[in-house]
Amino acid sequence: MVKIEKVLNGSQLKEFITFPFRLYKDNPYWIPPLISDEKFTLNKKKNPAFDYCEAELWLAYKDGKVAGRIAGIINHSYINKWGNRYARFGWIDFIDDYEVSKALFDTVEAWAKEKGMEGIHGPLGFCDLDKEGMLVEGFEEMGTFITIYNYPYYKEHIEKYGYVKDAEWIEIDISIPEDKDVVSKISALASKAKEKYGLSVVPLKKNKDVIPYIPEVFDMLNKAYEHLYGVVPITDKQVKTYVNQFFSFVNVDYICLIKGQDGKLAGFGIIIPSLSEAAKKSKGRLFPFGFIRFLKAIKKNDTLDLYLVAIKPELKGKGVPYVMLDELTRTALRNGVKRAIASPELETNHAVQSMWRNYNTRIHRRRRCYLKRFD
């Protein structure tokens, strides 16, 4: 028999956060999150997303042991913007037992209906910068620090329970070109764009050089991403939170800011050296030795994770991506980088996918957002 309990205290929250560490203990492809980040994100008093979200967490027990977990989220900003009265589910994990998964979904759906929702979709976080999308292809590919990994049976369970595909993201593995002709072609396209549209690269020597541009970066992010699936604006309070969380993981070599003729930001790329191996070895903890592994990964790495890329909407088609790619490709080659992993891109986002046409690429993972409308 399965028993469901709402998370109401610290010990239950600890069980909620650490359950995947046991579920994926022997899985070489799962990348653990930082436990401290999970505690912050799920804390209603600290995470500024709770200014416009409400959420509940549940644990499933079978034979006296934790067998699954799920979060239910109502994002009021999403409902106001998109007009869909959908709840979200996230932080979904369970053993391969349909009785367990059904109990979890029964619980979150009942909660959503009580709140007046007309459907539920996920896996999604509080906002678009949280992890999202259930893995449906690429189970034998190493995950990244910013994406969800799950077992193949998750897909079978959720589809059996009546959920259908609502959106799909692809992840692209990009080989850094060593062919001089390819590199020269990218540089030529960048030079042409610089000359024609007055574009220039902002010189950055230290992390602190990025700080004056942070408000402009997030303002552009909100505008460039506003039409993407489920996206809601990032608030000023959230900006401060994300900067505090991730700024220490930045290597300024891989931050690219492009200015337009008017001196304002035309586009940006935020790339983070892969933290996957460091996270696995640290088992979700920065201390006592985890931070050393993270620092080493940030300073020297042959793999990059493309975290965020955005272009000013009115400057699309003006060569901004070429300038960005030229700068980042030359830096990557200089630092011995072999490959880059693009963060999830909607399968319908052909504009972003076209950025990689001069590179050798392969789609190595797919992830999906599922939807269930209530009768």
Locations of regions flagged by a protein language model:
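A conserved beta-strand-loop-helix scaffold within acyl/acetyltransferase catalytic domains
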Residues: 20-62, 70-80, 204-309
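Short beta-strand-to-coil "C-cap" segments at the C-terminal boundary of structured domains/repeats
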Residues: 174-177, 371-375
